[in-house]
Amino acid sequence: MGTRLLPALFLVLLVLGFEVQGTQQPQQDEMPSPTFLTQVKESLSSYWESAKTAAQNLYEKTYLPAVDEKLRDLYSKSTAAMSTYTGIFTDQVLSVLKGEE
């Protein structure tokens, strides 16, 4: 796999994984209407549901607790680093805007 394809694939699988793990909301029953827009909406909804099901099956098949723990650790370390660098950047911007006293 190319280096460009790997992050894109990772992000798509991550988004689908979060969608699969999200809470299920009950769908409201609507009156069937034969309009074109409703048919398109139902078609897109069925495609989305099949993609979610496929992603859930793939996630369940390839779930590795060690990888999950590493990803959680990587996320916590990267957010800690980003908050540190954001604080430094904010201090620098404020000192530039405030000027010398």
From Swiss-Prot:
Keywords: Chylomicron, Disease variant, Glycoprotein, HDL, Hyperlipidemia, LDL, Lipid degradation, Lipid metabolism, Lipid transport, Secreted, Sialic acid, Signal, Transport, VLDL. It holds the Pfam family Apo-CII. It is found in: Secreted. The keyword Transferase does not apply. GO terms for molecular function: lipase inhibitor activity; lipid binding; lipoprotein lipase activator activity; molecular function activator activity; phospholipase activator activity; phospholipase binding. Liver and intestine. Its main location: secreted. Residues 1-22 form the signal peptide. Residues 23-38 are annotated as: O-glycosylated at one site. Proapolipoprotein C-II is synthesized as a sialic acid containing glycoprotein which is subsequently desialylated prior to its proteolytic processing. One of its GO terms (biological process) is lipoprotein catabolic process. GO terms for cellular component: chylomicron; early endosome; extracellular region; extracellular space; intermediate-density lipoprotein particle; low-density lipoprotein particle; spherical high-density lipoprotein particle; very-low-density lipoprotein particle. Residues 78-101 are annotated as: Lipoprotein lipase cofactor. Residues 66-74 are annotated as: Lipid binding. Component of chylomicrons, very low-density lipoproteins (VLDL), low-density lipoproteins (LDL), and high-density lipoproteins (HDL) in plasma. Plays an important role in lipoprotein metabolism as an activator of lipoprotein lipase. Both proapolipoprotein C-II and apolipoprotein C-II can activate lipoprotein lipase. In normolipidemic individuals, it is mainly distributed in the HDL, whereas in hypertriglyceridemic individuals, predominantly found in the VLDL and LDL. Belongs to the apolipoprotein C2 family. It is linked to Hyperlipoproteinemia 1B: Autosomal recessive trait characterized by hypertriglyceridemia, xanthomas, and increased risk of pancreatitis and early atherosclerosis. This is Apolipoprotein C-II. The gene is APOC2.
